[in-house]
């Protein structure tokens, strides 16, 4: 019923009184009732359903002219009274929110009064239809009352939503204040105290902003919120080490500049969260979080890209096709749009890394577009010929734009593939670190210069990827990958210079290591969005991480007949698991990287199982952050059980593979790792099935399960690496298919369905792949 649905859903807006704050939210516009969150939309669905039933009842009666049955009349009357009762409870919640938030009190009282009157009006109209079936109640009156009711209820919900927005902004204000205190602190003891408070405030903001992110309807805003939250999480670690380095070496200019740069990036992330929760409308002063105006707009979704320019041109051409005319205003706009596209493609043609033949192809496509544009905008004296030729010209220009878009995509993806395949980051950063520790200033300067050039190349590649992004989410993600690299590169160099000045400083070394790790995360982000962009551009559905929904349902087809009551861990427990969860995430990245090496040969069972296990471990890592598809401890345990089953299957697959490996040191290493897998699987399965009572015991079980999963994942990473070494050294390749169960002379092969592995002659391995093979696997060369 509408009553129960609305009362339960609106209860989420109930909030306790909060202290006054200077947070300012956008002013409420009663004429703009656009719904931007899923919760408001879901709250309105039951009410819309009931109102639709009432209107349809009246319409069907007027169409047939026959009195309805008593059952139908009672149902309609019951709906009217239920809607009125639900609105009354709904209004009571709204008035409670108004009492606790003085800034929205007048508007909320007014909206509640309006909703109460509209609910009573709907109930009266429903009674009128049932008391006297022959009475004439105009449908327009009923529709008008329905609109008034929906409008007033939506207004109450939007006002309540302002309270949630204000809570996020207040949490940001607390962090901004703590950042200013951290920035002015000169004592290490004071810094530790303030940072402890700052950490608690970050947890509060993470939960409030996370709830808001999941509630947003706009994919663009959700992507921006996700990026801002991830940036804050990474920057917090950088802030800790950079501040400790500066406090240890207060006279070091590079340490001060590095710390100040991290502070500035954190304030930019806070500003981006504020933009997301306020939907781009900020009434706060510009200096609220950042003093200086940034070089680029914070809302990166406003930036124009080559793909966006092509899309604008395509929409204009479609309008011309429909109207069959090109007016003076349209002519000016379409020429301006083509000029903008030509300017944006200069990032491709001016790049030193773009091959000459690809540069010429892009310029040729642009020249063809200009030629077709000239034919389109030139007036023709013969109107009949103009009308017949216009559609042909529009079709030709559309085809040229598609060809240009495809060529830009090829150029961008090839450059990204090359830079990721080279993998220069680790070599440069480790060399710079080694020179800094040894006090080799010349060596540090040398590798700093190389890293600076490499970082510029990475940013240029990111810019090309940004140009070819075709969805709102990818547009945001690719733009912020470039921005993060542009901000992180000079800070990493400053951290290296600090270590060079103080080579014996442990905290300076730790600071550089953290910056290097963060740069590696940025490179992983680039790899991920590059693959997603390639998938989206080719019209394929992006492969999601293997989610919990793929697991067997407990009780019906699963392994646990009586699942324990799901328990959701609180913030403190999640914080305790964050460290081991992060370690497991790093292992998933390592397994993914090792699995990607096999793409040169074939997509075999080892690769598939490694990627599947990496996906499941990643979901368990997200659980330690309070995110992802695993919502309760029961979900986690079921996922861990399935993870152990996958590990057992991996064991059988690699064992079959090991039969083709000749006796050697490599086979001994592989066998030694392989023997440890069943033990870890058994331990994990025992932990999952062990009963627990109480929250403390459950947390202990969760901690043990995640720790054992991490240990098993570590062995899987070693196993994949050892298998790859054997496959490449002894030229063993996967042929596909399955074989019937059989037992060899040694009695080892007993699997019913096994991977077919065969030794490959060296001459075949050395043969270069054909061009068709290269083109078919162009997208698979992007490493994650």
Curated annotation (Swiss-Prot):
Region span, Vinculin/alpha-catenin homology 2 (VH2) region: 552-696
Segments of skewed composition (Basic and acidic residues): 745-756
Tissue specificity as recorded in UniProt: Expressed in body wall muscles, vulval muscles, stomatointestinal cells and pharyngeal muscle cells. Expressed in enteric muscles, nerve ring neurons and in the ventral nerve cord.
Region described as Disordered: 737-784
Molecular function terms from GO: actin filament binding; cadherin binding
Amino acid composition bias (Low complexity), ranges on this chain: 771-784
Compartment annotation: Cytoplasm
Free-text note regarding domains: The vinculin/alpha-catenin homology 1 (VH1) region plays a critical role in interacting with dyb-1 and mediates the localization of ctn-1 near dense bodies.
Protein name (database record): Alpha-catulin
Classification lineage: Eukaryota, Metazoa, Ecdysozoa, Nematoda, Chromadorea
């Amino acid at each position: 019923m509408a009553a129960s649905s609305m009362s339960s859903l609106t209860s989420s807006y109930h909030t306790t009184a909060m202290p006054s704050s200077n947070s300012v939210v956008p002013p409420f516009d009663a004429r703009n009732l656009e719904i931007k969150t899923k919760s408001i939309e879901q709250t309105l669905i039951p009410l819309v359903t009931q109102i639709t039933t009432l209107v349809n009842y009246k319409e069907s009666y007027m169409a047939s002219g026959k009195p309805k049955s008593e059952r139908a009349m009672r149902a309609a009357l019951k709906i009217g009274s239920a809607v009125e009762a639900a609105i009354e409870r709904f209004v009571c919640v709204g008035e409670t929110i108004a009492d606790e938030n003085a800034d929205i009190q007048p508007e909320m009282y007014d909206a509640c009064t309006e909703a109460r009157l509209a609910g009573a009006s709907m109930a009266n109209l429903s009674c009128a239809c049932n008391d006297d079936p022959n009475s004439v109640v105009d449908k327009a009156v009923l529709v008008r009352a329905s609109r008034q009711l929906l409008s007033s209820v939506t207004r109450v919900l939007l006002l309540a939503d302002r309270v949630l927005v204000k809570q996020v902004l207040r949490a940001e204000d607390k962090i901004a204040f703590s950042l200013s205190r951290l920035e002015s602190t000169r004592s290490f003891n004071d810094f530790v105290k303030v940072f402890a408070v700052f950490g608690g405030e970050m947890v509060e903001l993470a939960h409030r902003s996370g709830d808001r992110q999941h509630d947003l309807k706009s994919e663009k805003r959700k992507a921006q919120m996700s990026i801002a939250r991830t940036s804050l999480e990474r920057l917090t670690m950088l802030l800790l080490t950079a501040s400790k380095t500066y406090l240890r070496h207060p006279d070091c200019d590079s340490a001060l500049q590095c710390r100040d740069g991290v502070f500035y990036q954190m304030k930019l992330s806070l500003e981006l969260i504020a933009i997301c929760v306020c939907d781009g409308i900020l009434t706060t002063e510009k200096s609220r979080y950042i003093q200086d105006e940034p070089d680029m707009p914070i809302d990166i979704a406003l930036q124009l890209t080559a793909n966006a320019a092509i899309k604008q041109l395509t929409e204009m051409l479609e309008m011309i096709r429909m109207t069959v005319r090109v007016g003076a205003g349209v002519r000016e706009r379409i020429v301006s749009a083509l000029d903008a596209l030509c300017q944006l493609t200069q990032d491709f043609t001016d790049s030193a890394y773009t091959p000459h033949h690809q540069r010429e192809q892009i310029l040729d496509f642009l020249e063809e577009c200009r030629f077709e544009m000239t034919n389109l905008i030139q007036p023709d004296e013969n109107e009949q010929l103009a009308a017949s030729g216009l559609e042909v010209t529009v079709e030709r220009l559309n085809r040229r734009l598609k060809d240009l878009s495809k060529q830009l995509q090829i150029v961008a993806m090839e450059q990204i593939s090359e830079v990721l395949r080279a993998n220069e980051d680790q070599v440069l950063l480790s060399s710079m670190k080694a020179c800094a520790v040894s006090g080799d200033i010349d060596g540090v300067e040398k590798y700093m210069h190389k890293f600076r050039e490499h970082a510029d190349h990475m940013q240029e590649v990111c810019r090309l990827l940004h140009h070819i992004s075709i969805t709102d989410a990818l547009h945001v993600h690719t733009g912020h990958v470039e921005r993060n690299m542009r901000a992180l590169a000079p800070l990493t160099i400053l951290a290296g210079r600090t270590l060079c000045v103080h080579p014996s400083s442990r905290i300076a070394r730790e600071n550089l290591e953290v910056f290097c790790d963060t740069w590696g995360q940025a490179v992983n982000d680039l790899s991920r969005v590059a693959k997603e962009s390639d998938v989206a551009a080719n019209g394929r559905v992006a492969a999601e991480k293997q989610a919990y929904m793929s697991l067997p349902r407990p009780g019906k087809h699963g392994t646990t007949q009586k699942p324990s009551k799901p328990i959701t861990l609180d913030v403190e427990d999640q914080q305790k698991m964050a460290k081991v969860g992060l370690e497991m995430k790093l292992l998933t990245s390592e397994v993914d990287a090792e699995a990607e090496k096999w793409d040169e040969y074939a997509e075999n069972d080892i690769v598939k199982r490694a990627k599947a296990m990496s996906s499941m471990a990643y979901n368990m890592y997200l659980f330690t952050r309070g995110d992802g598809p695993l919502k309760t401890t029961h979900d986690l345990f079921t996922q861990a059980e399935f993870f152990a089953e996958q590990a057992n299957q991996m064991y059988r697959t690699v064992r079959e593979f090991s039969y083709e490996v000749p006796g050697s040191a490599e086979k001994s290493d592989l066998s030694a790792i392989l023997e440890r897998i069943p033990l870890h699987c058994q331990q994990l399965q025992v932990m999952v099935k062990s009963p627990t009572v109480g929250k403390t015991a459950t947390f202990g079980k969760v901690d043990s399960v995640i720790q054992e999963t991490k240990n098993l994942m570590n062995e899987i990473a070693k196993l994949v690496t050892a298998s790859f070494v054997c496959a490449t050294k002894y030229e063993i390749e996967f042929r596909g298919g399955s074989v019937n169960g059989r037992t060899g002379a040694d009695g080892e092969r007993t699997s019913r369905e096994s991977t077919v592995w065969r030794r490959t002659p060296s001459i075949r391995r050395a043969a270069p792949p054909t061009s068709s093979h290269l083109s078919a696997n162009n997208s698979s060369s992007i490493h994650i």
